[in-house]
Regions:
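Active-site histidine-anchored catalytic micro-motif
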Residues: 1, 7
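C-terminal accessory/tail domains of diverse enzymes
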Residues: 12-188
Length: 188
């Protein structure tokens, strides 16, 4: 079974925004994996952000794309120019950014024919990209998620998926989460 990979133009990204993107994905890994129903057997092709990579990125605070690229490929013995490089098999793939088409790839989406779900995937990818580009800094710290549905809904609102225009996106992205979308501490 193939999956949906969304490629976003990386031309406007800076070292700061790439680090933001890494931290955003790292902090929301668990929530995204549950919301998007990423199956355990797909994990080898769609790994969560590597904690060691995130830690190195935040400790070193690279100021150039070359420095970010070096950190991204650290620990891999194969050539960086290898098309099917092992670094690419993560929810957030920067291999396509550094080698080839200059795009940032998000790989966490199931094969789907439902137009509303596909739209939700694309809107989420674009909103994540926008957050990475515009936010001054992003933390890799995982948020408290005692109520997954509330956490996802408030996060989606925070990144701009507000109003009737994004109602279906919010519904699709919160559908498989537990809890109550309206109340943080009230049972569903």
């Amino acid at each position: 079974m193939h999956n949906i990979h969304i490629h976003i133009d990386g031309a406007d990204h800076t070292p700061r925004s790439i680090r933001n993107f890494i931290n955003i994905i790292a902090s929301k890994n668990d929530l995204f994996y549950k919301a998007l129903q990423i199956e355990p057997d797909r994990m080898r092709f769609c790994k969560k952000m590597d904690a060691a990579l995130v830690e190195k990125m935040n400790r070193r605070r690279p100021k150039t794309m070359a420095a970010i690229e070096n950190i991204w490929y650290e620990g891999y013995s194969e050539s960086r120019s290898t098309h099917y490089h092992n670094s690419r098999y993560h929810f957030l793939n920067l291999h396509s950014f550094f080698n080839g088409n200059g795009t940032i790839e998000l790989r966490g989406f199931n094969s789907e024919l439902h137009a509303g779900k596909i739209r939700s995937y694309i809107v989420l990818a674009l909103a994540l990209n926008h957050q990475a580009l515009t936010q001054k800094c992003a933390s890799s710290k995982k948020p408290q998620v005692e109520n997954e549905k509330f956490a996802m809904r408030t996060y989606l609102n925070r990144i701009g998926l507000i109003g009737d225009e994004f109602k279906n996106c919010r519904e699709h992205l919160c559908r498989h989460l537990s809890g109550n979308a309206a109340w943080r501490f009230r049972a569903a």
